[in-house]
Amino acid sequence: MENTQIRYAKLLLDYCLEIKPGDKLYIATSMLAEPLIREVYRYATQLGAQTEIDFQFSGKSKMFFDNAPDELLTSEPVFHKKALEEFDAYLNIRAPYNLNETSNIDPEKRKKRSEALQEINNIYFERTADRHAPGALRRCLCQYPTEASAQKANMSLEEYSAFVYQACHLNAENPKAEWLKIREDQQRIKEYLDKVKEMQYKSDKTDIRFSVEGRTWINSDGQANMPSGEVFSAPVEDSVNGKVYFSYPSIYMGRDVSGISLWVENGKIIKWDAEEGGEVLDQVFSIAGANYFGEVAIGTNYNIRQSTRNILFDEKIGGTIHMAVGQSYKQCGGLNRSSIHWDMITDMTESGQIYADGKLIYEKGKFLI
């Protein structure tokens, strides 16, 4: 059997990004991911792709916020924008040095930077909406195990590496075949939900309703995110009503927020509370468009069995649902626009239920359809 990094590289390029000769591939990562990057670059070159790599180094983000004058803080990153406008494929390999690096940055600076990136975010969401459309950008977000991520997950690096590779099915004889089977299984759920008009998430601390009439559900099958395992859509913006409690911790710009409760009327989040980090919510909901939901979703990856305080994995946990405030996905038919897209997750395995047009379709973390 090939070593893990070779298998990972082939899965990312063959399955996730479907790299072809002549493709322009843009990779964003850190120097810590070098073992994987070497194999990705080697294989991309063998496939005939032109590859450019944007490397982060330790402390770069904090250095930028600490030293950038306002005119730089509010400007667009030139190469990043050009790559998102012109390249064929974008691979974002998360390999952090320090997940708390920007935790103490001035909130006003964060807000200015977020607003400055709005146009680039719009380009990204437009070009990734349909990967099969002419001129589309095929994208994939994945994880390379580092000490920082392992510490955040309360694991050793060895344990965390095993967790990441299991979540991606890299230990399977044929990882690509595993993801093709997941695609087939989730397609049945997607097609059922596409016919639904109104949904309700319900549990001990949650009772929230929303319309998905005219919206499209997406089968997240490991191409855009590796790992994946979810179905998601965008609620009709003014249809969301009720209260939702998120049992998993959420992280925004390096800051922890736990036990989030949101109250919603006619789509707008009118009240919020948190057991920890409530001041972060005050900052978030001052951002344009953040008071409305951009995504509703159901996690289906039962190879992920615990929270690691990493949204790439946590939102896919089998037996959870999540909702995101802010930017909605164009491919779902969502209309909300914002410089933020922040996912929040809750466990459904104890008392959770999902109703579709009044019919119970999901209970205690499992679909009934």
Language-model segments: residues:
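Short polybasic amphipathic segments
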Residues: 199-201, 260, 270, 350-360
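Oxyanion-binding "anion nests"
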Residues: 227-272
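Short, glycine-/Ser/Thr-/acidic-enriched flexible segments
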Residues: 32, 96-98, 146, 215-217, ...
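Short acidic-glycine loop/turn motifs at beta-strand connectors
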Residues: 204-205, 214, 264-266, 356-359
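Active-site lining segments that contact anionic ligands and/or coordinate catalytic metals
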Residues: 241, 257-259, 266-269, 291-295, ...
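Active-site bordering "gate/hinge" segments
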Residues: 1-241
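Dual-mode signal for accessory low-complexity, basic/Gly-rich regions
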Residues: 271-335
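Intrinsically disordered terminal and processing segments
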Residues: 322-369
